[in-house]
């Protein structure tokens, strides 16, 4: 039955710490070629028991153009109106999204940070579900009531789970992590 969602090989399932059994509920949606933001956020919410998961599409990013592909007179990539680009990079909105997980208590917030218990599982699941290896950021938002003032000796990681001005942070206590460029 795992073959329906592309997980027929037991070695593939064993190689990652994702609870693949929860994926069976999405077998029909996973059989298709593309994944809508609603499907991706729904799967992530279901697999991690999260209530507030969303995706922002069409996020602006800058893509560097390798030197050998940059436009040069008398070289390839210099046909006006076809493949000419000026500069060493381009602005792109088709290859990046933001995965937002909101309303997390302090512990769940910590679980999704790079050194947290669920970070690697989440990254593997997103890679599997999206299929196309798009660039994305992970934005984690802590519940405002869980934002604590910075205090030495406490569970404090400046820039991750503590804020110099917690009053301002309570308005939008979010951390954005660049997962894939």
Predicted regions and their residues:
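Feature for intrinsically disordered/low-complexity regulatory segments and propeptides
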Residues: 1-72
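C-terminal structured domains
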Residues: 42, 46-181
């Amino acid at each position: 039955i795992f073959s329906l969602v592309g997980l027929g090989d037991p070695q593939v399932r064993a190689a990652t710490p994702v609870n693949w059994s929860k994926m069976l509920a999405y077998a029909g949606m996973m059989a298709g070629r593309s994944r809508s933001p609603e499907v991706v956020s729904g799967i992530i919410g279901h697999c991690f028991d999260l209530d507030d998961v969303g995706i922002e599409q069409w996020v602006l990013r800058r893509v560097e153009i390798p030197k050998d592909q940059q436009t040069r007179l008398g070289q390839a990539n210099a046909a006006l109106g076809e493949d000419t680009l000026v500069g060493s990079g381009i602005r792109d909105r088709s290859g990046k999204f933001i995965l937002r997980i909101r309303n997390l208590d302090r512990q769940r917030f910590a679980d999704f940070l790079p050194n947290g218990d669920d970070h690697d599982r989440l990254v593997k699941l997103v890679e599997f579900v999206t299929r196309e290896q798009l660039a994305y950021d992970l934005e984690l938002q802590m519940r405002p009531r869980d934002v604590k003032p910075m205090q030495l000796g406490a569970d404090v990681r400046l820039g991750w789970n503590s804020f110099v001005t917690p009053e301002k942070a309570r308005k939008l206590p979010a951390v954005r992590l660049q997962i894939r460029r």
